[in-house]
């Protein structure tokens, strides 16, 4: 692994459109160096025979049987509308003619 320089950090910051104060460049240089060293360690791990995964915990969809439930709340909903016209909600016009 090549050494990360202050110029490398400035370049990455510029690409990310970050304005880093000059007094923080040394800190970020060391942090980026450690991050990339860790990535090198991960690259060296033998993963032969390990199945690929996309998440740590299996996701299970909780499903239920659909069922029809008779409801008659139409009038209740219409009564709550701030403005209505017959059996329709009246809303402000948003598109020009």
From Swiss-Prot:
Protein name: Aspartyl/glutamyl-tRNA(Asn/Gln) amidotransferase subunit C
GO molecular function annotation: asparaginyl-tRNA synthase (glutamine-hydrolyzing) activity; ATP binding; glutaminyl-tRNA synthase (glutamine-hydrolyzing) activity
UniProt cross-references to Pfam families, sorted A to Z: GatC
Gene designation: gatC
SS bond list: none
Catalysis performed (reactions): L-glutamyl-tRNA(Gln) + L-glutamine + ATP + H2O = L-glutaminyl-tRNA(Gln) + L-glutamate + ADP + phosphate + H(+); L-aspartyl-tRNA(Asn) + L-glutamine + ATP + H2O = L-asparaginyl-tRNA(Asn) + L-glutamate + ADP + phosphate + 2 H(+)
Assigned keywords, A-Z: ATP-binding, Ligase, Nucleotide-binding, Protein biosynthesis
Record has Nucleotide-binding as a keyword: yes
Native source species: Synechococcus sp. (strain CC9311)
EC number in record: 6.3.5.-
GO biological process: glutaminyl-tRNAGln biosynthesis via transamidation; regulation of translational fidelity; translation
């Amino acid at each position: 692994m090549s050494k990360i320089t202050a110029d490398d950090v400035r370049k990455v910051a510029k690409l990310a459109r970050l304005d880093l104060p000059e007094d923080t460049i040394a800190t970020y240089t060391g942090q980026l160096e450690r991050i990339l060293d860790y990535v090198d360690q991960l690259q060296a791990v033998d993963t032969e025979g390990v199945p690929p995964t996309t998440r740590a915990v299996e996701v299970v969809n909780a499903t239920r049987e659909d069922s029809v439930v008779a409801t008659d709340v139409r009038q209740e909903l219409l009564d709550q509308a701030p403005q209505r016209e017959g059996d329709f909600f009246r809303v402000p016009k948003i598109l020009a003619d």
